[in-house]
């Protein structure tokens, strides 16, 4: 997210269960790349920052999409994650998130 917040010239940014908070919020017009945020709905690490992140991106005029996966916590896309309750692999959420990332890249890069 910090790369996107910096205004870097990249085609798009995807994050799986990434941190959303920052000490340097994006300024209006700075975020150039579309964003796809894939998050576990039960992720206690990101939950406190979601509303602030959404407001920040709206205020910045960013093109963003935030997806919460039910029943998923932090680390949901890492097959080796097995540290309940906060970091656990979720096969269904991981498959859906990877499919969404593929669609996002298809939109950006084409065939």
Walk through the language-model features, giving the residues of each.
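N-terminal Rossmann-fold cofactor-binding loop
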Residues: 17, 40-41
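Acidic beta-to-alpha connecting loop that harbors the catalytic carboxylate
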Residues: 41-44, 72-73
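Primarily recognizes the serine-hydrolase "nucleophile elbow" in alpha/beta-hydrolase
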Residues: 1-32
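Short, well-ordered secondary-structure micro-motifs
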Residues: 2, 25-26, 48, 78-80
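Short, hinge-like loop/turn segments at secondary-structure boundaries
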Residues: 30-34, 83-86
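Conserved alpha/beta-hydrolase "acid-adjacent" motif
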Residues: 44-52
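Short beta-strand/loop motif that positions the catalytic acidic residue
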Residues: 31, 36-39, 69
């Amino acid at each position: 997210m910090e790369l996107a917040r910096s205004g870097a010239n990249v085609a798009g940014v995807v994050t799986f269960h990434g941190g959303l908070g920052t000490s340097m919020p994006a300024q209006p017009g700075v975020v150039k790349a579309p964003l796809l945020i894939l998050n576990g709905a039960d992720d206690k690490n990101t939950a406190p920052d979601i509303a602030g992140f959404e407001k920040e991106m709206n205020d910045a005029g960013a093109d963003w999409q935030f997806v919460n996966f039910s029943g998923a916590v932090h680390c949901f896309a890492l097959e080796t994650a097995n540290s309940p309750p906060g970091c656990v692999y979720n096969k269904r959420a991981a498959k859906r998130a990877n499919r969404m990332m593929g669609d996002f890249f298809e939109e950006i890069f084409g065939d």
